[in-house]
């Protein structure tokens, strides 16, 4: 969804919109979510925003033994079950501005409709409906829309946009995800981008030995948000130089995502244009480490209240914000396209 915004909402040219409209009619819709999602706020609603639940699933569907993808993530027979590998909430305010909050997959919550507590990512075992209900009920945040992409979809999108540049001061690796980076800046293809985004056992070479990032999933969230910043900013530069070259990206996104039945990607992207012009802000949900039995989990920290209140529509945006898109570049792109 964020990449659709970058291509459509920021590009803005009429040709881009026509191409996008033709593509988005083919996007796969997930039946059954209407009963779970919050009512859409009208023009006079007290809640001045819409929240998108963005999900990266760890589904291996379509990956077969012996393929190039198998070496990185395995196939559906090797890795049983299906969980949400990445969970984010994108808040789009009616008067402009947007914020992205990442939820750690090990967050310990009550799973909606079960009366039992588990890690939040396990809710996806019972489908998108259960996950959306669990996120909404456990955090008190209304969810208005749902967007999902799986491993193969993520890889395809990155390859179609020509890769994403990531910089690291030291050599980095993750023997579990397949990540292997040299010091400096390099453009990641789909395979390596997936290894980077999935990395929970991230190590850096420190003079004479490999040092593990002790933050595990919290470190992964930080890297994912960095990746989103670079992907969006890279797309902005590409669109600025060639607004009509967005067709391949639009096709990749629409072929790779599943969305709720009532979401109109074009209208959503256009509504988010003003937000992109002001800059996208990213947050990590404050949590602390705990154990349940022998399992390591994360629980909500006390200082999460102000952030959750903002996403619930009950308080102002937290004061510590990080701008992830360059507003000046967005303005230049819109002006060049003749839209605004």
Model regions: which residues?
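Entry/capping segment at the start of metal-dependent catalytic domains
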Residues: 1-95
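C-terminal solvent-exposed extensions
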Residues: 62-67, 116, 252-340
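Extracytoplasmic/secreted envelope proteins and their assembly/folding machinery
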Residues: 84-86, 117, 128-136, 151-155, ...
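Second-shell loop/turn segments in exported
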Residues: 75-79, 117-125, 140-145, 183, ...
């Amino acid at each position: 969804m964020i990449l659709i915004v970058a291509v459509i909402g920021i590009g803005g040219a009429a040709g881009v919109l026509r191409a996008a409209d033709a593509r988005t009619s083919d996007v796969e819709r997930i039946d059954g979510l209407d009963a779970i999602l919050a009512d859409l706020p009208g023009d006079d609603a007290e809640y001045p925003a819409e929240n998108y639940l963005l999900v990266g699933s760890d589904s291996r569907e379509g990956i077969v033994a012996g393929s190039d993808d198998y070496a990185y993530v395995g196939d559906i027979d090797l890795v049983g079950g299906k969980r949400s590998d990445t969970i984010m909430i994108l808040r789009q305010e009616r008067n402009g501005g947007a914020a992205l909050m990442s939820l750690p997959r090990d967050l310990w919550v009550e799973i909606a409709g079960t009366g039992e507590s588990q890690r939040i990512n396990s809710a996806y075992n019972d489908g998108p409906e259960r996950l959306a209900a669990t996120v909404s009920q456990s955090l008190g945040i209304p969810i208005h829309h749902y967007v999902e992409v799986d491993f193969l979809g993520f890889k395809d999108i990155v390859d179609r946009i020509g890769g994403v540049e990531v910089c690291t001061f030291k050599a980095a690796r993750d023997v579990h995800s397949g990540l292997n980076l040299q010091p400096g800046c390099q453009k990641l293809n789909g395979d390596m981008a997936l290894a980077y985004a999935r990395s929970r056992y991230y190590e850096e070479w420190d003079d004479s030995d490999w040092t593990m990032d002790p933050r595990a999933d919290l470190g992964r969230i930080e890297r994912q948000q960095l990746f989103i910043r670079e992907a969006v900013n890279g797309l902005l530069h590409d669109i600025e130089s060639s607004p009509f070259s967005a067709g391949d990206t639009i096709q990749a996104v629409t072929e790779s995502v599943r969305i709720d039945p009532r979401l109109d990607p074009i209208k959503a992207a256009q509504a988010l244009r003003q937000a992109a012009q002001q800059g996208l802000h990213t947050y990590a949900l404050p949590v602390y480490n705990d154990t349940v039995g022998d399992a390591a989990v994360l629980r909500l920290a006390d200082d999460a209240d102000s952030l959750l209140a903002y996403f619930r529509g009950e308080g102002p945006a937290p004061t510590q914000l990080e701008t992830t898109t360059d507003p000046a570049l967005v303005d230049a792109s819109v002006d060049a396209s003749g839209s605004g």
